Amino acid sequence: MDAHDGEADELPPPPPVPANVVPIKADDVESEVPANKPAKPKRFPMARPGLGRKGQPIQLLANHYKVSVKSSEEYFFHYNVILKYEDDRPVDGKGVGRKVIDKLQQTYRSELSSKDFAYDGEKSLFTIGALPQVTNEFTVVLEDVSTGKTAANGSPGGNDSPGGSDRKRVRRPYQTKTFKVELCFAAKIPMNAIAQAIKGQESENSQEALRVLDIILRQHSAKQGCLLVRQSFFHNNPNNFVDLGGGVMGCRGFHSSFRGTQSGLSLNIDVSTTMIVKPGPVIDFLLANQKVDHPDRIDWQKAKRALKNLRIRTTPVNSEFKIIGLSDRNCNEQMFSLRQRNGNNGDVDEVEVTVYDYFVKNKGIELRYSGNLPCINVGKPKRPTYFPIELCSLIPLQRYTKALSTLQRSSLVEKSRQKPQERMSVLNDALRHSNYDSDPMLRASGISIAQNFTQVEGRVLQPPKLKAGNGEDIFPRNGRWNFNNKKLIQTCSVDKWAVVNFSARCDVRNLIRDLIRNASAKGIQMAEPFDVFEESPSLRRAPVSRRVDDMFEQIKSKLPGAPKFLLCLLPERKNCEVYGPWKRKCLAEFGIVTQCLAPQRVNDQYLLNLLLKINAKLGGINSLLQIEASPSIPLVSKTPTIILGMDVSHGQPGQSDRPSIAAVVSSRQWPLISKYRASVHTQSPKLEMMSSLFKPRGTEDDGLIRESLIDFYTSSGKRKPDHVIVFRDGVSESQFTQVINIELDQIIEACKFLDEKWSPKFTVIVAQKNHHTKFFQSGSPDNVPPGTVVDKQVCHPRNYDFYMCAHAGMIGTTRPTHYHVLHDEIGFSPDDLQELVHSLSYVYQRSTTAISVVAPICYAHLAAAQVGTFLKFEDMSDASSSQGGHTSVGSVPVPELPRLHEKVRSSMFFC
């Protein structure tokens, strides 16, 4: 699912950084390579050392369509596009660019040697072969361009048809609009670079050539009137819409992109979903968005934020505008100056009228309910243009870029499910309906697309055997296991604990009784709680900080000492407002392990899942890999090895100023690989590269890695790790060189800071979940079995990558995780590395199922999300200006997170 912010028609993502280029900021050039220090040799993603062989062979289909490319000595010519109005003002609207270029192509076809264009909608245009001139200047006239401009301030109907009395106040829409277009030669790209990319000989040219092909796909969809979101396109077809409530709809479309693979060039097509605003009357959207049943109950400040920058169509004149805000007063009170010609002497007088009177009396338009509501402003900040709200309707295919509610997310998942066979049918239909073979630019590029899925050879790895309590074995089946009649392998004792109840609905006594009974069955010694602390009903509407503080005052006044553990019953769902302040109080201020729950239907399975989390948080282990308990993991069990999981969590859509949160989890108590701890820092908003792995401050290092290394040393018999395995989540292919240069260098510096002579070996692996490759069993309606690994046919032609489906896809179509091995000094064989990755999907202590990505990455995501709630309730402006904040280059200060209490710093508090 596409969940990124962005304009409807924007540039494709930049191509991956070529092998001979490492991106750096211009400002950092001097500081990066000091005069007295030679530049470090740069690392590049490693080549594939071989293929895996372990596992049961399985024949699969992938949603890649093979592409044949005719050999060509031609070139793609790249031209920069400069668009201006007739008066030399730059054209800033994105939608008009394609219309202008299409008209240019029609008008000047002979002057352009009948060349076809590939235009990205912005500033880049490509042709096959050169245009007649290096610089080409044209004048283009578009008809029926409605500008929405007005002649003077305050007019309520810039595109209306005024009567004789106000004809000078409002111009009719321009019937034609003149543009100046300049096409300037920028570069040429050999088309045979595509063939080089397929052979694994990547260069800047090959990436640019593939980018041109992707731009052709986008242009092809744009000509069909689609909404474009990166490489995905969405048709205005109500059959593709699902109502999620709140005035939001899920819109199903398709992703399409060209990819170089081991078997040649392929077209990857997949189902994609984006969120759109429900089209129709503005008032209907606002009522649904705010969940109210009458316009009088609308919060107009919220409405203003929700409507800003959306586009509307007005009646009765059918003109389109962008909303910039709302009027300060209601429609029947909002005044503006109207110039009218005096019938007696022909002079022009100015009169003050309300927007309501203008439309009702001057225009003869009946307004049923707009009088007491604000107007829609479609003008400019200093030149407002107002329309009554009931004359405005939201146009289709406008992206909704704010965060979805929990209910909306659940609804989207429920309504977007597709079984594998259904998805295959939908994708094949999408390719046929796209009719790419008719595209003149693709034909001229020598591109021909097959109509069938690519056949792929996969392998199914055996699930790892697990160890439970009393030496019993667990044999997972279909990615699942259970603890029926078994105990946990290493249990904690819960003796100093209490229950905190913010909920008025829960039967606390029965919950405690059943929890203790289930704990005993799994080998956990759980005493009766010291007390149950009930929130006073009078505080339930109080500020959340007061509610949490009051609860801790109760605890301190009644308990003889600090509890080891607090069970917290939340008033509603888990992400309620109490959650963040409660976690912060427990983990940062008092060092108390806490487990929150919002029980609705409590049964023994629910309580077992709860106990798995409690046991892990308090230092226990629920199950171990048999090869971990032996220990016999190749290259891990015999040499001290630390495993790191790294992730950066960003603010949700609409929270662009919220700091990003970087988390590093690290294994402890080697030779175990099932126990972890976490370190978390804030960094600049939307910054994906980690900036806090190594942070020297005088004689100290305040970075994330130092804490992990010291904890490994103290928990592993005073051994320093000789091997460091890094799993990195959330980065794109264009950022791979930064991971193995900028981030890996920080980790190495952190090691050297502790011991100059210490030189561990590193393996760096990136895990990607947001890709569009899916696998299907030919002739079977089922998902691919858990343990399926693919490293042939559809993987990179040179680089070391593979796809892993470790989990059982119970609903919809399984999404494999795409692992990229960027760097491997340790020297794993392909089989050993794939087995390790597979095994790490079985050490997730929160559940009894294999998970879709290695546990260290899941833990890093959980840690970042949980500690991120510490900031959710702070005044960000105050936090940003406090002395505790740190400042990144060219940005505002970033608030620092409170440090975790030493009692819980090495715990699995995030579990």
Curated annotation (Swiss-Prot):
GO terms for cellular component: cytoplasm; nucleus. One of its GO terms (molecular function) is RNA endonuclease activity. GO terms for biological process: regulatory ncRNA-mediated gene silencing. Keywords: RNA-mediated gene silencing. InterPro entries: ArgoL1 (IPR014811), ArgoL2 (IPR032472), Argonaute_Mid_dom (IPR032473), Argonaute_N (IPR032474), PAZ_dom (IPR003100), PAZ_dom_sf (IPR036085), Piwi (IPR003165), Piwi_ago-like (IPR045246). Residues 1-51, 149-171 are annotated as: Disordered. Residues 565-872 form the Piwi domain. Residues 281-396 form the PAZ domain. The keyword Transmembrane helix does not apply. Probably involved in the RNA silencing pathway. May bind to short RNAs such as microRNAs (miRNAs) or short interfering RNAs (siRNAs), and represses the translation of mRNAs which are complementary to them. Belongs to the argonaute family. Ago subfamily. PANTHER family: EUKARYOTIC TRANSLATION INITIATION FACTOR 2C. This is Protein argonaute 4B. It comes from Oryza sativa subsp. japonica. The lineage of its organism: Eukaryota, Viridiplantae, Streptophyta, Embryophyta, Tracheophyta.
